[in-house]
From Swiss-Prot:
It is found in: Cytoplasm, Myofibril. It comes from the Eukaryota. SUPFAM superfamilies: Myosin rod fragments (SSF90257), P-loop containing nucleoside triphosphate hydrolases (SSF52540), Tropomyosin (SSF57997). One of its GO terms (biological process) is muscle organ development. Expressed in fetal bone, thymus, placenta, heart, brain, and liver. Belongs to the TRAFAC class myosin-kinesin ATPase superfamily. Myosin family. This is Myosin-3. GO terms for molecular function: actin filament binding; ATP binding; ATP hydrolysis activity; calmodulin binding; microfilament motor activity; myosin phosphatase activity. PANTHER family: MYOSIN HEAVY CHAIN, NON-MUSCLE, MYOSIN-3. ATP binds at G179, E180, S181, G182, A183, G184, K185, T186. Changing L1344P: In CPSFS1A; uncertain significance.
Length: 1940
């Protein structure tokens, strides 16, 4: 596996080739149990993943991933591979090789878009059905020169390996790409050619000198593909660009690895597609490209149209393909023809023959009257075809209809039937296209043959894979036989490689040729008396049939060959005649039509015309075709008689044998393409389909072969490292043992089957499955070891803990014992005397200790001076080292320049040598070629001379014959005509021979000239050769001298010896790439030399830097020792200071206890305290100086390290630059990269050292800072808490009052919400009532619609009854029956009525005129009825529409407000949750703060002895006052942020309440709208007034609430001021108390004589001070609470003020919106009413038409003569009626859409959605266009109705009314446009309001986020303070305990 950095070379394609290291590790660490995880056979998905639950009675219970339980047999359960094998790149390395493992590995990689996977020698690729960036130029460069194991699987890797094998092994290569149609074979073939054209491009050297060449060889190779695709690719069901032929592309390379030429061989072109396609397919692309009219000149040239349906051959399936642009593809095809050097004549012929094939499909023939013979049905198409083919049309038609057939020795004209002629035309079309395609391939090969010297080739085989269809014919047998041969070839090749691997590793192995497994099936097909042999034999017999062929197969093979079987009969499938067992499965074949397909007969008479065609291309295509006619005329053709009857199968076998012989001479590489699904869905994989292809492609066959051998192999070192844990005792510790022996001992000690593995020279080989067993054993072993280790660790930790508990217990006992003893003796008189005397005894000791401290302090100063002197010395040494470094750099640079000069001379000589050798080789080869050409020319010259002499003799003989003929001419007048014809023929022959003679003479002379020139060239080349040999000898001698010089240099610079060796090896490896790199090397030589010198300089610098680094490391260690010494000294000093402080405290205590101490002792104590303070200050100054010195040293050290780091970075950059040029030079990068890695390692070591030093220094600094911080924290906390106490107590009361007010307002809002809910329930009830009404109205509407449809039918019958009343009844009856048969089930009822009417009409023919008058009366009566019905329908429709609209509007509004209410409720809940969480956090902070205060008080009580020191530190407290003030500001800022958060919460609640108010208002508006529809507009106005009054009352209540808030705010301000005054008074009292305490302390010091009285006063003062402190703590806590409450109340007040302003603004907005909605609703209602009236008018017109129809029906029932006319006009007038019905429905739909859009506009006006308004505008424009279309349709219908105006005047009136309605609708649309514009303006205004609200919301959200951030910061600070307080408290407690 390559690292992620190595994958960066592939750019954006890296994730699609190999997953990152992190993803691979995560996948491998997934849980896995090898005993339960498995694959199981599944009926749904073939195989499914699952877990084994139980196994009993020969059945296994498995639970699948989708929680299904399956009970299967043990053989249906397959082992699953461990996670380390997931998405493995080579499936042959799977430890469990089985079908489901392969399937799921492919599937997992495919879902990750890794489409390429190795399977042993195979590369399996899955079609992704989408574009992936895995073919970009950077990917090509990434695979260039990489071995297979060095890069992820890819088609480029296969291609590059083939290319490298060709260069190194000097052996031809082949790449076999197979797969089903649509699997990606053609795309991968293109990528292979693209890769070779990129890496082996010839550039300018490959340009052909011939003027026909239009591009480089690479361009031509690439351009051949689009031309072949145009003529050989077509759309199929699976693939839009399916190759319908196989091809083998050979790309030839020269001696240097450059492209030299290429050629193409094709196989099995599907020529039947030319004349027949399935429905979902189409013919070859070239036909549709021509018809795309991208090149109009082709349309004119080929005499065709642009409509594909004019040509039956190409229009049987689909015409257009969505993924293909035929016009652009035509340009690409035409460009490819030009690039490939086709002449204009060839190009024209190519297009003409393609067009002729299209015309062939239009040729029509008919049967002669009273004969079975065919004759042409028109000659126009034949004329076009003949013109394009260069034939005579009459000859062509005659040859098709009356071909000449040879019977015996005579020719007979045979008449053809129409079917035979059509078959002949189809066969000729296919033959012309096939030969045209083959000629095109030959012509491409001629162009790609550049005559450049070529050495080896790489062949790319793109051929169809194994095919198993429901119907398999001869084509499938050929394809499957090809794959059978290829699979046999693969099996043999694969195991030969395996055998070589085993032989190289020294493993005993019996060779098994798996290629023999397929021999039986192959012999059955191709051997004598095989299937192909019998087929060809049957084709020789004229009376043979498909049945006789089948019988022969049965007789020969059924029961004798295991691979030949009789197929099973399956219902629903086509009949199959025999089955073959292939390696991929059993295939049923049908032999229908095999004999005809194999013979492939052609009309020889037409072929003869082709051979004489004036179209040179057509004549050339059939020039070698031997007809019977030609056979009788020429002797030479008789030799080729057999070839004229060459069958399709024989030709196929010949090509296949040629292909296999080519492949056997190559080293093959296999690519198998897989189609993942049938629907072309990216990322989806159908298991059954993929498994079928894996079997057909031989992938599973390859895995079967792998399982026979040892598929898993591991290097000995890797195996020992990974599996040593299985039995570590088997490998002895402490002594060297070879890895192979260690693996042998390890495997021998494990309980496994020892026949399942073998030991090679470098690897250990395993059978399939054994490696998985070892993995399971390793996992179990690791689990046991980890469990044991955990147990040992837990035991050790518990023992340590127990020891601590025991020690703690003993210490407690000791302390208790000492305390009890002390309590017993402390009241003894002698003990009291001891307490008084002992302090006096220690004074002398104290003086001694002070003296020792002074001495130590002096020593510390001396050591500091010494360290400073050492530092200066080190700085001087550093300067000298830098100077030495610069000198060494100059020296190294000079040496490296000299070395580079020598290397350059050496490289130039080596290059010159290789160039000269290559030139000598080329000259030698050219000389040999010239000699061969010279010999050939000499032979040709002799042959030409012989032919010339023979021609001369022939000419003499012909001249004699001519003289004789002239004499006989005068004598024989009867034969004059024949002789004249013979004479003219002879004249032409003489002229022809004369021309040939002249041409031969010219050729002879040219050959002589060429021979002389070639001889001169040979002589000059020989001279040049001798000169070059001399130069080579000179260069070799100079090379020897240079080698000696190089050896001398290598002795001086041994380090560079490896570099030169690698350079020489890389030069030898790059011989083949030398010509390509010559020009680039010239440009890069100078730059490379500079870089090389720089690199060598940097190497030497790196060595120097390493030395300096070591020195600096030593110096750093010394400094560390000094620092440690300083730390120890400082710790000792600190300890002494603490001891002195403790002793001082003890002295003070004892002084207090011993009240009778003299003033001299007090003065002595003061003096000692002063000295102690002085010593402490001196110590602190020394500490500061020491820290400054350490910081300076660290800075200098950091500077030097940074300088070294910069230099190392420079080296790193140079390394990276050289790595980029690695692919261009490949010379000395390996050694350079190793040196750079060493430098980078040294840099990393330096960085680690620097980091450790910095950590140590930071720790020391941190300790110092903590000591200083601990001294000042208590004082800062005291002053801060005193200032906070007063203000917080006042704020508490203000907050409580505000909270009570807010609770009252909240209750009011809750009541309003309940009222809204009640109103919503009432609306739901009203909605249900409307729904019932709507349902009943819809039912009525349906009834009326059915009546309307009946009236429409009557109208149609009327129109039919009024046409052609005087026709004969019998004729119309027959027509009526014919029409009735064609009608559908809808007319069954009409047919019965018409039959009855026809019978009535036959009886009452004479009474027609009398009943016409009655029809008129009936018509008038029906018109009245229709009008009445129309009025009812209009009413019902209007009522239904109104109810429907009400229901829709109410549902929409209700749904919208429900969603809004739910969203608001969710927001409210979220806000409440957030508020509760914030309050809990606040409460926690308060509790924590109170705990901190309690701890502080305990600390103060416990440390009362430090009061004297606190008094001395008052000055420091004053200095820190500023810091306290800043902290106070930050606290206030945090509290403000907290208030902002609370404000945001309140704003959210206010927004919720505002939304609820909106809901109330909108519901009221809805109520108004409904009442407005049901009642009058006046009532609606009153409701709006009522709504205004309600809003006014709401405003008044809000105003009163606002006034209350203002009053409460004033009250809160007053309370705040009062509490601030109280706080100031408390602070004054506290300051007085502090001053009194200070005065008391001073008084204590001044009074000496009255010590006892002063002591009593002092104790009283101290107790009073402690009481004051306790009171102060209580006040501080209360002040904090009050402060928080004040801030909350202040925020609440500000929020209330803002809410009031917002409510006022929203009230104004809502009033304006109500007015606006009112006006909009009024206008919309008017518009709706207008639309309803228009709709009713349209319906009335339709009802008029229906009345007319009913009148006409009455007339028709009474009119007998009109029945016949009605039958004739039935179909036409029903179409007209249907059109009118569609028109009516369209109009109704248009009106409904307009109503719907108006409703949406209403809603949009409420919502203010600008985008919806725009959509509405676009929709109205569409409606305008639809109305215009409907206008046109209506005018057309009016025109149609005018035809019947003469007979039905009523319909004229209706058409006029229709036009009026259309005009009214147009006016209505114009009005709607005006309305829409007004809506648009309103929407824009609403949008502006929405934007304003949105900005407010964003601002509030931003403030909330900032407040949260500030709260987090404050919380972190509080936590830090709390932690520091705890630390300080604990330290004080420890000190106190130690003092006691």
């Amino acid at each position: 596996m390559s690292s992620d950095t190595e994958m960066e070379v592939f750019g954006i394609a890296a994730p699609f080739l190999r997953k990152s290291e992190k993803e691979r590790i995560e996948a491998q660490n997934q849980p896995f149990d090898a005993k339960t995880y498995c694959f199981v056979v599944d009926s749904k998905e073939e195989y499914a993943k699952g877990k084994i639950k139980s196994s009993q009675d020969g059945k296994v219970t498995v639970e699948t991933e989708d929680n299904r339980t399956l009970v299967v047999k043990p053989e249906d359960v397959y082992a699953m591979n461990p996670p380390k094998f997931d998405r493995i790149e080579d499936m042959a390395m799977l430890t469990h090789l089985n079908e489901p493992a392969v399937l799921y590995n492919l599937k997992d990689r495919y879902t990750s878009w890794m489409i390429y996977t190795y399977s042993g020698l195979f590369c399996v690729t899955v079609n992704p059905y989408k574009w992936l960036p895995v073919y970009n130029p950077e990917v090509v460069e990434g695979y260039r020169g990489k071995k297979r194991q060095e890069a992820p699987p890819h088609i480029f890797s296969i291609s590059d390996n083939a290319y490298q094998f060709m260069l190194t092994d000097r052996e031809n290569q082949s790449i076999l790409i197979t797969g089903e149609s649509g699997a990606g074979k053609t795309v991968n073939t293109k990528r292979v050619i693209q890769y070779f054209a990129t890496i082996a491009a010839t550039g300018d050297l490959a340009k052909k000198k011939d003027s026909k060449m239009k591009g480089t060889l690479e361009d031509q190779i690439i351009s051949a593909n689009p031309l072949l695709e145009a003529f050989g690719n077509a759309k199929t069901v699976r693939n839009d660009n399916s190759s319908r032929f196989g091809k083998f592309i050979r790309i030839h390379f020269g001696t240097t690895g450059k492209l030299a030429s290429a050629d193409i061989e094709t196989y099995l072109l599907e020529k039947s597609r030319v004349t027949f396609q399935l429905k979902a397919e189409r013919s070859y692309h070239i036909f549709y490209q021509i018809l795309s009219n991208k090149k109009p000149e082709l349309i004119e040239l080929l005499l065709i149209t642009t409509n594909p349906y004019d040509y039956p051959f190409i229009s049987q399936g689909e015409i257009l393909v969505a993924s293909i642009d035929d016009a652009e593809e035509l340009l690409a095809t035409d460009s490819a023809i030009d690039i490939l050097g086709f002449t204009p004549e060839e190009k024209s012929g190519l297009y003409k023959l393609t067009g002729a094939v299209m015309h062939y499909g239009n040729m029509k023939f008919k049967q002669k009257q009273r004969e079975e013979q065919a004759e042409p049905d028109g000659t126009e198409v034949a004329d076009k075809t003949a013109y394009l083919m260069g034939l005579n049309s009459s000859d062509l038609l005659k040859a098709l209809c009356f071909p000449r057939v040879k019977v015996g020795n005579e020719y007979v004209t045979k008449g053809q039937t129409v079917d035979q002629v059509h078959h002949a035309v189809n066969a000729l079309s296919k033959s012309v296209y096939e030969k045209l395609f083959l000629w095109m391939v030959t012509r491409i090969n001629q162009q790609l043959d550049t005559k450049l010297p070529r050495q080896h080739f790489i062949g790319v085989l793109d051929i169809a894979g194994f095919e198993i269809f429901e119907y398999n014919s001869l084509e499938q047998l050929c394809i499957n036989f090809t794959n059978e041969k290829l699979q046999q070839f693969f099996n043999h090749h694969m195991f030969v490689l395996e055998q070589e691997e085993y032989k190289k590793e020294g493993i005993e192995w019996t060779f098994i040729d798996f290629g023999m497994d397929l021999a039986a099936c192959i012999e059955l097909i191709e051997k004598p008396m095989g299937i192909f042999s019998i087929l060809e034999e049957e084709c020789m017999f004229p009376k043979a049939t498909d049945t006789s062929f089948k019988n022969k197969l049965y007789d020969q093979h059924l029961g004798k060959s295991n691979n030949f079987q009789k197929p099973k009969v399956v219902k629903g499938r086509a009949e199959a005649h025999f089955s073959l067992i292939h390696y991929a499965g059993t295939v049923d074949y049908s032999v229908s039509g095999w004999l005809e397909k194999n013979k492939d007969p052609l009309n020889e008479t037409v072929v003869g015309l082709y051979q004489k065609s004036s179209n040179r291309l057509l004549a050339h295509l059939y020039a070698t075709f031997a007809t019977a006619d030609a056979d009788s005329g020429k002797k030479k053709v008789a030799k080729k008689k057999g070839s004229s009857f060459q069958t399709v199968s024989a030709l196929f076998r010949e090509n296949l044998n040629k292909l296999m012989s080519n492949l056997r001479t190559t080293h093959p590489h296999f690519v198998r393409c897989i189609i993942p699904n049938e629907t072309k869905t990216p990322g989806a994989m159908e298991h059954s389909l993929v498994l079928h292809q894996l079997r057909c492609n031989g992938v599973l066959e390859g895995i079967r072969i792998c399982r026979k051998g040892f598929p898993n192999r591991i290097l000995y070192g890797d195996f020992k490292q990974r599996y040593r844990v299985l039995n570590a005792s088997a490998i002895p510790e402490g002594q060297f043992i070879d890895s192979k022996k260690a693996c042998e001992k390890l495997l021998a000690s494990i309980d496994i089957d020892h026949t399942q593995y073998k030991f090679g020279h470098t690897k250990v080989f395993f059978k399939a499955g054994l490696l998985g067993t070892l993995e399971e054993m390793r996992d179990d072993r690791l689990a046991k070891l980890i469990t044991r280790t955990q147990a040992v660790c837990r035991g050790f930790l518990m023992r340590v803990e127990f020891q601590k508990m025991v020690q703690r217990r003993e210490s407690i006992f000791c302390i208790q014992y000492n305390i009890r003893s002390f309590m017993n003796v402390k009241h003894w008189p002698w003990m009291k005397l001891f307490f008084k005397i002992k302090p006096l005894l220690k004074s002398a000791e104290t003086e001694k200790e002070m003296a020792t401290m002074k001495e130590e302090f002096q020593k510390t100063k001396d050591e500091l001076a010494k360290s400073e002197a050492k530092r200066k010395e080190l700085e001087e040494k550093l300067v000298t080292l830098v100077q030495e470094k610069n000198d060494l750099q100059l020296q190294v640079q000079a040496e490296s320049e000299n070395l580079l000069d020598a290397e350059e001379r050496c490289d130039q000589l080596i290059k010159a040598k290789f160039q000269l050798e290559a030139k000598i080789k080329e000259v030698t080869e050219r000389a040999e070629d010239e000699e061969e050409i010279n010999a050939e020319l000499t032979a040709k010259k002799r042959k030409l001379e012989d032919e010339c002499s023979e021609l001369k003799k022939d000419i003499d003989d012909l001249e004699l014959t001519l003289a004789k003929v002239e004499k006989e001419k005068h004598a024989t007048e009867n034969k004059v005509k024949n002789l004249t014809e013979e004479l003219s023929g002879l004249d032409e022959t003489i002229a022809k021979l004369t021309r040939e003679k002249k041409a031969l003479q010219e050729a002879h002379q040219q050959a002589l000239d060429d021979l002389q020139a070639e001889e001169d060239k040979v002589n000059s080349l020989n001279k040049t050769k001798s000169k070059l040999e001399q130069q080579v000898e000179d260069l070799e001698s100079s090379l020897e001298q240079e080698k000696k010089l190089r050896v001398d240099l290598e002795r001086n610079k041994r380090k560079l010896e490896g570099d030169l060796k690698l350079a020489q090896e890389s030069i030898l490896d790059l011989e083949n790439d030398k010509q390509q790199l010559d020009e680039r090397l010239k440009k890069k030589d100078f730059e490379y030399c500079q870089l090389q010198s720089k690199v060598e300089d940097e190497q030497t610098l790196g060595l120097q830097f390493q030395k300096k680094i070591k020195e600096l490391q030593a110096r750093i260690e010394e400094l560390e020792e000094e620092i440690e010494a300083e730390r120890a000294t400082r710790a000792k000093t600190e300890k002494q200071r603490s001891d002195y402080a403790r002793e001082l405290e003890e002295l003070s205590e004892r002084l207090e206890e011993a009240g009778g101490v003299t003033s001299t002792q007090i003065e002595l104590n003061k003096k000692r305290e002063a000295e102690f303070l002085k010593l402490r200050r001196d110590l602190e100054e020394a500490t500061l100086q020491h820290e400054a010195m350490v910081a300076a040293l660290r800075k200098k050290h950091a500077d030097s390290v940074a300088e070294l780091g910069e230099q190392i970075d420079n080296l790193q950059r140079v390394k990276q630059k050289l790595e980029k040029e690695k692919s261009e030079f490949k010379l000395e990068i390996d050694d350079l990269s190793s040196s750079m890695e060493s430098v980078s390692k040294s840099k990393a070591n330096l960085e680690k050292i620097c980091r450790t030093l910095e950590d140590q220094l930071s720790e020391a600094r941190g300790k110092n800072e903590e000591i200083q911080r601990s001294l000042s924290e208590l004082t800062t906390q005291k002053s801060r808490l005193q200032t906070e106490a007063g203000e917080l107590s006042r704020q508490l009361e203000e907050k409580e009052s505000i909270v009570s007010q807010l609770s009252r307002s909240k209750q009011a809002f809750t009541q309003q919400t309940e009222e809204l809910k009640r109103q919503l329930e009432e609306e739901n009830k009203a909605k249900n009532a409307l729904a019932h009404a709507l349902q009943s109205s819809r039912h009525d509407c349906d009834l009326l619609r059915e009546q309307y449809e009946e009236e429409q039918e009557g109208k149609a019958e009327l129109q039919r009854a009024l046409s052609k009343a005087n026709s004969e009844v019998a004729q119309w009856r027959t027509k009526y029956e014919t029409d009735a048969i064609q009608r559908t089930e809808e007319l069954e009822e009409a047919k019965k009525k018409l039959a009855q009417r026809l019978q009535d009409s036959e009886e009452q023919v004479e009474a027609v005129n009398a009943k016409c008058a009655s029809l008129e009366k009936t018509k008038q009566r029906l018109q009245g009825e229709v009008e009445d019905l129309m009025v009812d329908v209009e009413r019902a429709n209007s009522l239904a529409a109104a109810l429907d609209k009400k229901q829709r509007n109410f549902d929409k509004v209700l749904a919208e407000w429900k969603t809004k209410c739910e969203e608001s409720q969710a927001e409210l809940e979220a806000s409440l949750k957030e508020s509760r969480s914030l309050s809990t956090e606040l409460f926690k902070l308060k509790n924590a703060y109170e705990e901190a205060l309690d701890q502080l008080e305990t600390v103060k009580r416990e440390n009362k002895n430090l009061e004297q020191e606190i008094a001395d530190l008052t000055e420091q407290i004053a200095e820190n006052g500023k810091t306290i003030h800043e902290l106070e500001k930050s606290r206030k800022q945090i509290e403000l942020e907290k208030a902002d958060i609370q404000l945001a919460l309140e704003e959210a609640e206010a927004a919720l309440e505002h939304e609820e108010a909106k809901i109330l208002r909108i519901q009221l508006e809805l109520t108004q709208v409904k009442s407005e529809i049901d009642r009058k507009i006046a009532e609606k106005d009153e409701e709006i007034e009522q709504l205004k009054r309600n809003y006014q009352r709401t405003v008044e209540t809000m105003q009163s609430a606002l006034d209350a808030e203002v009053r409460s705010r004033n009250e809160a301000i007053r309370l705040k001021k009062k509490m601030e005054g109280d706080l100031n008074e408390i602070e004054i009292q506290l300051s007085h108390a502090n001053r009194q305490a200070a005065e008391t302390l001073k008084h204590l010091r001044s009074v000496q004589g009255q010590l006892k009285d002063t002591q009593l006063h002092l104790d009283d003062a101290l107790r009073g001070q402690e009481d004051l402190k306790e009171q102060l703590a209580i006040v501080e806590r209360r002040a904090n609470l009050l402060q928080a409450e004040v801030e909350e109340l202040r925020a609440t007040l500000e929020q209330t003020e803002r809410a009031r302003k917002l409510a006022e603004q929203e009230l104004l907005d809502s009033n304006e919106r109500v007015q606006l909605l009112h006006t909009q609703n009024t206008s919309l209602i008017h518009t709706k009413k207008k639309l309803e009236t228009d709709l009713m008018q349209l319906q009335s017109e339709v009802e008029d038409a229906s009345r007319d129809a009913r009148n006409a029906e009455e007339k028709a029932k009474k009119a007998i003569t009109d029945a016949a006319m009605m039958a004739e006009e039935l179909k036409k007038e029903q179409d007209t009626s249907a059109h009118l019905e569609r028109m009516k429905k369209n109009l109704e739909q248009t009106v409904k859409d307009l109503q719907h859009r108006l409703d949406e506009a209403e809603q949009l006006a409420l919502k203010g959605g600008k985008k919806q308004i725009q959509k509405l505008e676009t929709r109205i424009r569409e409606l305008e266009f639809e109305l215009e279309g409907e206008q046109k349709k209506n005018t057309e219908s009016v025109k149609g109705l005018r035809k019947y105006e003469r007979r039905v005047k009523e319909l004229t009136y209706q058409s006029e009314e229709d036009r009026k309605n259309v005009l009214r609708l147009q006016d209505l649309v114009d009005k709607l446009q005006v309305k829409v514009k007004s809506y648009k303006r309103q929407a824009e205004e609403a949008d502006e309001q929405a934007n304003a609200h949105l900005t407010k919301f964003r601002k509030a959200q931003h403030e909330l986020e900032e407040a949260e951030e500030r709260a987090d910061i404050a919380e972190s600070q509080v936590n830090k303070l709390r932690a520091k307080t705890r630390d300080f408290t604990s330290s004080r407690m420890v000190v106190h305990e130690s003092e006691e």
